Curated annotation (Swiss-Prot):
This is Glucose-1-phosphate adenylyltransferase. It comes from Frankia alni (strain DSM 45986 / CECT 9034 / ACN14a). It catalyses: alpha-D-glucose 1-phosphate + ATP + H(+) = ADP-alpha-D-glucose + diphosphate. CDD domains: ADP_Glucose_PP (cd02508), LbH_G1P_AT_C (cd04651). SUPFAM superfamilies: Nucleotide-diphospho-sugar transferases, Trimeric LpxA-like enzymes. One of its GO terms (molecular function) is glucose-1-phosphate adenylyltransferase activity. Homotetramer. The lineage of its organism: Bacteria, Bacillati, Actinomycetota, Actinomycetes, Frankiales. Keywords: ATP-binding, Carbohydrate metabolism, Glycogen biosynthesis, Glycogen metabolism, Nucleotide-binding, Nucleotidyltransferase, Transferase. Pathway: Glycan biosynthesis; glycogen biosynthesis. PANTHER family: GLUCOSE-1-PHOSPHATE ADENYLYLTRANSFERASE (PTHR43523:SF2), GLUCOSE-1-PHOSPHATE ADENYLYLTRANSFERASE-RELATED (PTHR43523).
Length: 412
């Protein structure tokens, strides 16, 4: 049987308000992660590693940095018709922007018609994980379903925070799609677990087009993929679930197999990066068999100075990107993005420091996120006194992580 022709659609229009101020000037999928990456690099790497090389990224909210990242990083040879391209809202169906994730695809159906795929893979743009989507596509074709939804096994209590998939006894056909239920249903054979929707879908093309057109004609619809399109197909008994725990990615270990993180809040974003700093992190960035691709700035290697016991530049349990200079400061459990400068006697402990931020002499940064081009003057403190941080106008998360926005000079 010949391989199906697959088109990838990546939904990247989210505003990410819970990640503010990191999303004040950028779309959520463009938020930096892990030193070198953007959140969108994870889904695009999964698709490209699988050989799916015709991908449209549907953008809308403050998309300039996201569009620039895609066009400079994800350049495919077009000799064989391959592409990764950002597609902004174009008002093809009238003078309005995208009204929801389903409307974004409906307004972009010209892409589907032009490419004429057998299968349309619709994935979200802002989760951290590895997945081989070929295995999900294979199950979809074998099942004969109109749509297959990726399901993540989570404890039932955690299911209250997700869209939840209820299946029949066979564990495959979806009987109900529940939005943040108070009492999530257990799984057949595993009653203490439930299926949380990952927001990843595989559609037979004709089924997707038909569902989108019906949804567009419904004035009461929210035009949302998870809230409207999937329930419509569930009612037709045309929806199946794909168990993410069955997915085997080359190079993964038993420890990081099945890893998936929604980093949509400041605390979850921070926690996922602190995990990367651990001696044995759950998520392995160093898997060469299924790499996470990105563009790396042309900067020199990281440097640590001085050879002086009173101010030795040192980084412990940390990720240090190219262009970083740790000049006599101490860094513990931190992710330092390219071009960061840590000066003498400075202390950086449990922090995410984004591109070109500068921490001055004797300054302290603790339990904090510094966005790009932040300047912490000599002797200043961030994250030490949360009440003082709030008084200075900085965001403090529910769990006490201080966030300083892009380009801010910290006041003493």
């Amino acid at each position: 049987m010949p391989s199906p022709r697959v088109l990838g659609l990546v939904l990247a229009g989210g505003a990410g308000r819970r990640l503010a101020p990191l999303t004040a000037d950028r779309a959520k999928p463009a938020v930096p992660f892990g030193g070198l990456y953007r959140l969108i690099d994870f889904v695009l790497s999964n698709l490209v590693n699988a050989g799916y090389l015709r991908i449209a990224v549907l953008t809308q909210y403050k998309s300039h940095s996201l569009d620039r990242h895609i066009t400079t990083t994800w350049r495919m040879s077009n000799l064989l018709g391959n592409y990764v391209t950002p597609v902004p809202a174009q008002q093809r169906l009238g003078p309005r922007w995208f009204a929801g994730s389903a409307d974004a695809i409906h307004q972009s159906l010209n892409l589907v018609h032009d490419d004429n795929p057998d299968i349309v893979v619709v994935f979200g743009a802002d989760h951290v994980y590895r997945m081989d989507p070929r295995q999900m596509v294979a199950q979809h074709l074998d099942s004969g379903a109109g749509v297959t939804v990726a399901g993540l096994r989570v404890p039932r209590a955690e299911g209250r925070s997700f869209g939840v998939i209820q299946t029949g006894r066979d564990g495959r056909i979806i009987e109900a799609f529940l939005e943040k239920p108070a009492d999530p249903p257990g799984l057949p054979g595993s009653p203490e677990e439930t299926f949380a929707s990952m927001g990843n879908y595989v559609f037979s093309t004709d089924v997707l087009i038909d569902a989108l057109r019906k949804d567009a004609a419904d004035e009461d619809s929210r035009h949302d993929m998870g809230g409207d399109i999937i329930p419509m197909l569930v009612a037709q008994r045309a929806a199946a679930v794909y168990d993410f725990s069955d997915n085997v990615v080359p190079g993964t270990t038993a420890r990081d197999r099945g890893y998936w993180r929604d980093v949509g809040t400041l605390d979850s974003y921070f926690d996922a990066q602190m995990d990367l700093c651990a001696l044995d992190p759950v998520f392995n960035l160093y898997n060469r068999e299924w790499p996470i691709f990105t563009s790396v700035p042309s900067l020199p290697p990281a440097k640590f100075v001085h050879d002086d016991p009173r101010r030795t530049g040192i980084a412990i349990n940390s990720i240090v990107s190219n262009g970083v200079i740790v000049s006599g400061g101490t860094v513990r459990s931190a992710v330092l993005s390219p071009g960061v400068r840590i000066n003498s006697w400075a202390e950086v402990d449990r922090a995410v420091v984004l591109d070109n931020a500068v921490v001055g002499r004797g300054a302290v940064v603790r339990d904090a996120i510094l966005d790009k081009n932040v300047h912490v003057p000599p002797g200043a403190q961030v994250g030490v006194d949360k009440d003082r941080d709030r008084a200075r106008g900085y965001t403090v998360s529910e769990r006490g992580i201080t966030v300083v926005g892009k380009g801010v000079t910290v006041t003493d």
